[in-house]
Amino acid sequence: MYLLPLPAAARVALRRLGVRGLWDRGLSTADMTKGLVLGIYSKDKDDDVPQFTSAGENFNKLVSGRLREMLNISGPPLKAGKTRTFYGLHQDFPSVVVVGLGKRSAGVDDQENWHEGKENIRAAVAAGCRQVQDLELPSVEVDPCGDAQAAAEGAVLGLYEYDDLKQKKKVAVSAKLHGSGDLEAWEKGVLFASGQNLARQLMESPANEMTPTRFAEVIEKNLKSASSKTEVHIRTKSWIEEQEMGSFLSVAKGSEEPPVFLEIHYTGSPNATEAPLVFVGKGITFDSGGISIKASANMDLMRADMGGAATICSAIVSAAKLNLPINIIGLAPLCENMPSGKANKPGDVVRARNGKTIQVDNTDAEGRLILADALCYAHTFNPKVIINAATLTGAMDVALGSGATGVFTNSSWLWNKLFEASVETGDRVWRMPLFEHYTRQVIDCQLADVNNLGKYRSAGACTAAAFLREFVTHTKWAHLDIAGVMTNKDEIPYLRKGMSGRPTRTLIEFLLRFSKDSS
C-alpha cells in the first residue's frame, strides 16, 4: 500500500489522530516510529528528470521505482527547501519526506559569501525533519545529501525548540544518519549544531531563571562533562573588587542579583603553558537600560543580552568536545542592568581596570562598560588572539540586520580567518570600520578620559567599537557585534523563531581551523 501526499485537511486530521491510525490494516506499532528524509536535486540542463541523491536513488530502487512514480504524479518538481511526504512506501519507514536540495552544482557564492549547496542542505533537511516531528514520529533517518555535516546541522538545528518550561512539549525526535555514509562528518555536524543549541537555550531562558549565577553553573556543568582538560572559576563580587573592575561593578550595583565573573579554561595543547586564545563575551542577563530605561515594547528580548557570553562559552564547550589541541580561555562578566537607588546615573564617572576613567552619559550603553574591564583582564594571559562577542548596539541591527555579524578588527589576518570560517558555516560575518574618525568621537569627553557614547548619534556601532578599542593593546583583536543576529524571525529557514545562538558555529569553525593551522 502507498498513499499520495495528503491534502491540507487530511494532514490536520492526521496530526490530531497520529499517524499510527492510518496503519491499522498494515503495519505494527513497532513500525510506526521512524521517518525517512531523502533529497532530490533540481533538474540540470543535462537531466531528463530531477535526480535523487545516492541514498534517494537506492531507496527508489528498493521500492521498485514507486517513489519516483509518486513524485511525478503528485505535483511539480520540488524547489529548494520544499518538501513532499509519502506514506506506506516501505514497512520500515511509514513516512518518507522528499526534500528539494536545489542544484547539485551549487557551491561557494562569492556574492552571498556562503556555500549555497551547504545552506540548501541545512534548510531542506530541517524542513523534512520538522515534517516527521509534526507526524509525532520519535525518530528519523536522514539522507547525508552529499554533505553529512550540513545535513546533521540542518536536522539538529531545525528540530530544536525551547519548550523547557512548557507542560505540553513537541515530540522529541532523534535524528540519525541514513545508510553507511560519512558518520564522522555527521557526528561533527551534530556537535556543531548542539553547540549552537546550547547558546539558544541560554539566550531563550527567562531572566529570573538564567541569573548570572545560574548561567555560570550551566556552563560549568557542560564544560566539565565535555572534557577533563577544563577548569572553571566562578569569581564573586569580592574578587571583582580586588581586580579593580570599577566599570563592571558600576553596572552590576543597580541589581539585587550578585555579579559573577566567569573564567573558563580549556587546556588542549600538549604544552600547557602555550599562549591561549581568549574569548570574551558580554553577559548582561537582563538589560532594562538602567536609569536610561528602555521602552517597554520588546524589553523581554533583553533576557538574551548575554548572547555574547552564551556564544563564546558554547563554542569553547564544543572545542573541548572536539579535543582541539589548543589552549582557550573564556571570560564572561555577568550581571543585570537595572534601575535602582544604587544604579549608575547619567553623568557618573567610573574607573576601569586599566585606570582609564569613563563618563557614563547613557546607562543603557552598559555592555561596553563591562567588556572594558574584561578586555583589560584578557591581556594578562598573553594571548595569541582576543575575540569578544556582544549584543552591543541597536545600530548594528539597523546597519546589517540579521544578514551577518558585524566584525571590527585591527588585524586583517584575523578578519580573513573569521570570514573563511563563516563561509563554511553559512553564519556570515561582515567587516566594519575601526577608523580614528570614530575614536575621536568617544575621547572628546568633558569629565573623563572616554565617554560611553559617541559625540554624535550617527554610527553607533562604530563608536561602540572605538570605545572598546581604548581598552585593547593587542594587535590581533576582533569585536563581534551580534545584536542584529540575536533573534531569528523567519530569515534563517533551519532555525525556528526565537533566539538564534549565532554565530556559535562560526566561532567553532574558527577554532577548528586555528588548531589545524597551529599543528
UniProtKB/Swiss-Prot annotation:
EC number of this enzyme: 3.4.11.1, 3.4.13.23, 3.4.11.5
GO cellular component term, pick one: cytoplasm
GO molecular function: carboxypeptidase activity; manganese ion binding; metalloaminopeptidase activity; peptidase activity
Catalytic site: K294, R368
Binding annotation for Zn(2+) 3: L202, M203, R303
PROSITE patterns registered for this protein in UniProt: CYTOSOL_AP (PS00631)
Cofactor binding remark: Binds two metal ions per subunit. Two metal binding sites with different affinities are located in the enzyme active site and can be occupied in vitro by different metals: site 1 is occupied by Zn(2+), Mn(2+), Mg(2+) or Co(2+), while the tight binding site 2 can be occupied by only Zn(2+) or Co(2+). One Zn(2+) ion is tightly bound to site 2 and essential for enzyme activity in vivo, while site 1 can be occupied by different metals to give different enzymatic activities. Mn(2+) is required for Cys-Gly hydrolysis activity.
Binding site for Mg(2+): D287, D364, E366
Catalytic activity: Release of an N-terminal amino acid, Xaa-|-Yaa-, in which Xaa is preferably Leu, but may be other amino acids including Pro although not Arg or Lys, and Yaa may be Pro. Amino acid amides and methyl esters are also readily hydrolyzed, but rates on arylamides are exceedingly low; an S-substituted L-cysteinylglycine + H2O = an S-substituted L-cysteine + glycine; L-cysteinylglycine + H2O = L-cysteine + glycine; S-benzyl-L-cysteinylglycine + H2O = S-benzyl-L-cysteine + glycine
Enzyme class: hydrolase
Annotated control of activity: Bimane-S-cysteinylglycine-hydrolyzing activity is inhibited by o-phenanthroline or bestatin, and is activated by the addition of zinc chloride.
Chain positions recorded as Zn(2+) 2 binding sites: K282, D287, D305, E366
InterPro entries linked to this entry: Leucine_aapep/pepB, Macro_dom-like, Peptidase_M17_C, Peptidase_M17_leu_NH2_pept, Peptidase_M17_N
Cofactor(s) the record lists: Zn(2+); Mn(2+)
Subcellular location: Cytoplasm
Residues with the Phosphoserine modification: S42, S54, S180, S194, S238
GO biological process, one term: proteolysis
Positions that bind Zn(2+) 1: D287, D364, E366
Record PTM N6-succinyllysine, positions in chain: K45, K61, K103, K221, K455, K476, K489
Source species, domain of life: Eukaryota
Pfam family for this entry, one: Peptidase_M17_N
Family stated for the protein in its record: Belongs to the peptidase M17 family.
Annotated function: Cytosolic metallopeptidase that catalyzes the removal of unsubstituted N-terminal hydrophobic amino acids from various peptides. The presence of Zn(2+) ions is essential for the peptidase activity, and the association with other cofactors can modulate the substrate spectificity of the enzyme. For instance, in the presence of Mn(2+), it displays a specific Cys-Gly hydrolyzing activity of Cys-Gly-S-conjugates. Involved in the metabolism of glutathione and in the degradation of glutathione S-conjugates, which may play a role in the control of the cell redox status.
Name by which UniProt lists this protein: Cytosol aminopeptidase
Annotated organism of origin: Rattus norvegicus
Organism ancestry: Eukaryota, Metazoa, Chordata, Craniata, Vertebrata
